[in-house]
């Protein structure tokens, strides 16, 4: 099974992310959906619960809208709080993400051409998401190419 960690602060108003989740829910034998904003409306993460959840899966997808060339705030908090020393990296007992397949599924509200060297922002989405790739490589996860839905 694949764990899909949904990080959308207002999924009910979403178009793309909401549709993705509706489609994934048709296959409960293949996907488990963990909605961070629903699980933690106060944004106070249960770190132990999150770590146990990660340990239970070999395939993890982070699904979120691209906000201000980054992530929704709760995903940044999740990365900072969950990926800690001696669990995610830095010791022989750590590296709990090691060899887990990890991918990003991102909705982007503008056209793909805008995210190019020649586009208005001068950077590709792959370049802008390099910190994710580096983070997951650092903790020895098997980082897969991102999937993006451009436009609305």
Question: What are the residue ranges of the model-derived segments?
Answer:
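Short histidine/acidic/glycine/proline-rich micro-motifs that form metal-
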Residues: 9-11, 38-40, 122, 150-152
